Structures are given as C-alpha cells and as structure tokens.
Curated annotation (Swiss-Prot):
<keyword id="KW-0325">Glycoprotein</keyword>
<dbReference type="Pfam" id="PF00150">
    <property type="entry name" value="Cellulase"/>
</dbReference>
<dbReference type="GO" id="GO:0071585">
    <property type="term" value="P:detoxification of cadmium ion"/>
</dbReference>
<keyword id="KW-0326">Glycosidase</keyword>
<dbReference type="GO" id="GO:0046686">
    <property type="term" value="P:response to cadmium ion"/>
</dbReference>
<feature type="glycosylation site" description="N-linked (GlcNAc...) asparagine">
    <location>
        <position position="343"/>
    </location>
</feature>
<keyword id="KW-0378">Hydrolase</keyword>
<feature type="active site" description="Proton donor">
    <location>
        <position position="203"/>
    </location>
</feature>
<feature type="glycosylation site" description="N-linked (GlcNAc...) asparagine">
    <location>
        <position position="75"/>
    </location>
</feature>
<comment type="similarity">
    <text>Belongs to the glycosyl hydrolase 5 (cellulase A) family.</text>
</comment>
<dbReference type="InterPro" id="IPR001547">
    <property type="entry name" value="Glyco_hydro_5"/>
</dbReference>
<dbReference type="InterPro" id="IPR017853">
    <property type="entry name" value="Glycoside_hydrolase_SF"/>
</dbReference>
<feature type="glycosylation site" description="N-linked (GlcNAc...) asparagine">
    <location>
        <position position="153"/>
    </location>
</feature>
<feature type="glycosylation site" description="N-linked (GlcNAc...) asparagine">
    <location>
        <position position="133"/>
    </location>
</feature>
<feature type="glycosylation site" description="N-linked (GlcNAc...) asparagine">
    <location>
        <position position="386"/>
    </location>
</feature>
<dbReference type="GO" id="GO:0048046">
    <property type="term" value="C:apoplast"/>
</dbReference>
<feature type="binding site">
    <location>
        <position position="87"/>
    </location>
    <ligand>
        <name>substrate</name>
    </ligand>
</feature>
C-alpha cells in the first residue's frame, strides 16, 4: 500500500507539471500513415497493441484526478501498450464536452487536452472517436433531440444519418475538434502526430435501413468532410465488423442473427476511398451466449481470420481490432477462459503481422486505474495487478513490437 501511495503521489506531481513536460519531453515520432495493408511510422511498418480508456477526458476534467491518466499511461508503456482508443465526445449531461450544438465546456475540453498531452509525453498514439451510436454519453440520440428542440421533424435516432441539421451538427463538432488548440502543447489537434487517427462513430448502426445503403452514404459524406478539414490523420469507421449484403456468404456464416438488421456492411463501409483502415470488434460471449466456450473460441478465430483475409484481398487496407475482451460475468467464467481469449486473439494478430499482412494490432476493452470503482465492469482490467491476462498482454505486445523493429515492408501489390 505504501508503494502504491508513493506511485500515485509521483503521478500527481507529474500531472501538475504536465504543461511543461508535455512540450519538453514530447516524442519525436511523426504521423502514422498507410502504405497498402500496413501502417507506416518514421519509414517503418507500425504494429502495436493497445487498450481502450473511454474515461480519459472525463477524469482529466478534474485536475485533482488527472494522476489516474498519468498512472494508466505509465503502466501501459511498461507493458508495451502504445495505442489508446478514447472518446472525443460527451454530448450533454454531467461533465459534457458539448453542452449544446456548437457550445463546449472549456474545462472538459482541457481534460481531453491533458490526455493528449500525456500520451504525447509518454509516447502513446491515440485513436479518438467523434460520436457514440448509443445514448450513453449523449450519442446519436442527443443530436436528434437537439434538432427536435428546434422544431425539426425527426422521430427516430436513425434520423441522425439523414436530417440536414443533424448532419451539420456533426460536421461542426468534427471541425471544432480538429481545429482545437491544445492548451498544454499549444498544437492544433489536426497537427498533432500523437493522434494516430479518428473514428467516425463508436459502433455505428442504422436499423431503419438494414440494406446498409443509408449508413454507407452517411459514412462517405462524413469521411470526405473529415478529410477536407484534416488531411494529416488516418480515418476509420468504428464498426463492429458485421457483414452486409455485399458479402452474403460471410453474413450467413459469421454474423450473429441479431446483427443482420443493424444496417452495417463491413466491406461496403470500408471500401470508401476516404476510409484508411478497417475497424472490427469481437465479443463472441455477447453475440453467441448459447454456445459453449470451445465453439465461441473457434468463432473468435474465424471472425478474425476472415476479416483479415478480406482486408488483405478486397479492401487492401490495414485492420485494427478496436475492441475485444472476456467478461467475468459470463456463466461459468474462469481466469483461464479469459487468458484463452487473449491468447487466441493476439496469436491471430501476430501471425498476420509477421507475414506483412493487414493486422496492425488489437485494443482490448478496457483499462481502468487502481481504485476506479465507478468505471469497473465485467470487462475492465487493472494493469498493475499483474494477472495472468496482463502477463499475456505484455508478452504478446513485446512480440508485436519486435516485428516493428525489423522494419520489413510488405511486398503485397496494391
């Protein structure tokens, strides 16, 4: 306990001086770019595992809890985790980033500034998501409600994708984000190489049009807009990876039945020219609750392998597994089962990367810091606990880093 208190105290001191450290100790790494199915950083292929920490800006809004961000990032680098995925939104509600359309809470924005500055100082790349599909933290529902309050004829959350005013709200948020000047680093977000890329939305879905055409049209419009205001950063969709009408065989053999009404199409959504890399998530426990553990593990491997095959041969773009995990509330759960999921996931990613394939890394859901009980859930992991799962994370991330060190470019023809 004394050791932990010392670490937390040290983290607080670092956090209090971060406005200087974030600038003076900034990593010299450049922007992550793409060449064929690989990411490139400083002229070499870039492979890296990472984690989700959606709570960064929320906790960093209060300067007295910013040490949690520092502590998590320090622990992440110890375990060779060098990408973090986080929310670039909190629409309405407590500690909102966007209080109303185009109206932002400066204190909350400074929380996101701090998280980016700390990631920069400690050499961690960031993937930042613009909005949520779900009503958690506002999301599509909040945007539609804002439009409804102005007298717009909207009745469904899916109007988010078609209503002109709602679409303009989204574009305004994107523009505000990319033009934000970080109060710690003094660098505009669009010029910040610490940001690896943006995601259009967290797990976009459109039940109003199961064909996928509405969502694809929205993604095309918004992806082109993002690129028009920020040409330096990579962009992806934030999709779960469910197949649509463009891949009928994959749709039948891989999708959970419930996913076939969500209006997403892994191939069509990612073939868009302005989308730089593919995004998938993996939760076989949630998607196939009636299957036994062995069957779910086999489906996990097949899910990853098929998406990697399509990223290589059809999309010709890199792929990041943006979310995965093993919930502790799965009936019959054991630590060994969680370890098996992490091993299978990381092994599949590594096998692709070692061959110069499209797998760039896996980001598990999700990391919390010691004592963060308000964010604890069946999927949360505390790195400092050094569980068997954490040991697997460390070993596999170091292996992936060694591929990066070899600097071999793919010979794949594009």
């Amino acid at each position: 306990m004394k050791c932990l208190c010392f670490v937390v105290l040290l983290a607080i001191l670092i956090a209090q001086n971060s406005s200087d450290l974030g600038v003076k100790s900034a990593s010299s790494d450049g922007f992550v770019s793409r060449k064929g199915v690989q990411f490139i950083l400083n002229g070499k292929p870039f492979y890296a595992n990472g984690f989700n920490a959606y709570w960064l800006a929320y906790e960093a809004t209060d300067s007295t809890t910013r040490f949690k961000i520092t502590y998590v990032f320090q622990n992440a680098t110890i375990h060779d985790l060098t990408i973090v995925r986080t929310w670039g939104f909190r629409d309405g509600g407590y500690r909102a980033l966007q209080i109303a359309p185009g109206v932002y809470d400066e204190k909350t924005f400074q929380g996101l500034d701090f998280a980016i500055a700390e990631a920069k100082r400690l050499g961690i790349k960031m993937i930042i998501t613009f909005v949520n599909n779900y009503s958690d933290f506002g999301g599509r529902k909040q945007y539609v409600d804002w439009a409804k309050n102005t007298g717009q004829n909207v009745s469904s959350d899916d109007d988010f994708y078609t209503n002109p005013l709602v679409k303009q709200y989204y574009k305004n948020h994107v523009k505000t984000m990319v033009n934000r000047v970080n109060t710690f680093t003094k660098v505009e977000y669009k010029d910040e190489p610490t940001i690896m890329g943006w995601e259009l939305m967290n797990e976009p879905q459109c039940r109003a049009d199961p064909s996928g055409k509405t969502l694809t049209a929205w993604m095309n419009e918004m992806a082109l807009y993002v690129k028009s205001v920020d040409s330096k950063h990579l962009l992806s969709t934030g999709l779960e990876g469910f197949y649509g009408d463009s891949s009928p065989q994959r749709k039948t053999s891989l999708n959970p039945v419930a996913a076939n009404v969500l209006g997403t199409d892994f191939i069509a959504n990612h073939k868009l020219d302005a989308i730089d890399f593919a995004s998938i998530h993996s939760y076989p426990d949630l998607w196939f609750p009636n299957l036994d553990e062995k069957s779910r593990l086999n489906l996990l491997r097949k899910w990853l392998e098929c998406h990697l095959e399509d990223a290589q041969n059809i999309l010709k773009k890199p792929l990041i597994l943006g979310e995965f995990g093993k919930p502790t509330n799965t009936p019959g759960y054991t630590q060994a089962q969680r370890d098996a999921v992490f091993n299978a996931t990381f092994d599949t990613i590594y096998e692709s990367a070692e061959k110069g394939g499209p797998a760039a890394g896996a980001l598990f859901w999700h990391v919390i810091s010691d004592g963060m009980n308000n964010f604890k859930d069946p999927l949360s992991i505390v790195l400092s606990e050094n569980s068997t799962t954490v040991n697997i994370i460390t070993e596999e991330s170091r292996k992936l880093g060694l591929i990066r060190g070899k600097g071999k470019l793919s010979k794949t023809k594009i």
